[in-house]
Amino acid sequence: MITFYDETGKGYGAQVELKTKNAVNGERSISGTIVSNKQVLSRLDRGWSFTFDGELYKIIYAKPKDEGKNISLSFDAVHQFFYDFEHSNCYKEFNGSNRFEVYIEEIFKNSGYRYVIEAEAKAIRKENFGNASRLKMFKEIIKAAGLEFSVTGKVVRIVKKVGTDLSTVVRKNFNMNELTIEKNIGNFITYKKGLGAWKDENNHD
């Protein structure tokens, strides 16, 4: 049983099958299938959250599945850090060469997260770098420095690179154009009750 929280903080328990994924560069994502609780099945939306192993995750994608008499809902979720940093901007703009620490300090300023740098990095030259999401800037400067990071709670550890680039899951799910719920889940539930059907399977508006 997992408790999902809507954006007002109200909780809803549901039976869920989970698959977790931890990869290089801090990725902590979870995929799952919800099989019970009509309130969750019909209302789950981007930004809902749940806790797993003491860490908070945010829903970024959901898709209902017709299983005959029943409906299940598959979803993807990412650690709160990725969600928060994608939805928060850093308005500072950099031009020229700066120490790695200067970039990191500005990216994390007033973010609610703190960082620990456990590796050395050379100065990095950037032009017109800034005025973007914290996540975009953070990923770019980490890549430029040749480092990696891991996330636990509200703490981000920046370490020497030992793995490879971000996984497909993170690259896909943090394209802002793809951060959407695939279908209108409420309408899907209505359809299953026999009250209507999609006119266009690819257009559920």
Which ranges hold each PLM region?
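Envelope-exposed proteins and targeting segments
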Residues: 28, 55, 71-73, 154, ...
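Acidic, small/polar-enriched beta strand-loop surface segments
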Residues: 166-205
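Amphipathic, non-transmembrane alpha-helical segments in extracytoplasmic/periplasmic proteins
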Residues: 32, 77, 90-115, 128-153, ...
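Juxtamembrane "anchor/assembly" segments of surface/extracellular structural proteins
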Residues: 1-43, 80-82
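Surface-exposed cap/loop segments at beta↔alpha junctions
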Residues: 35-115
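Short, charged/polar, Gly/Pro-enriched secondary-structure boundary elements
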Residues: 80-88, 163-172
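Surface-exposed aromatic
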Residues: 119-127
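Acidic/histidine-enriched alpha-helical segments
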Residues: 154-163
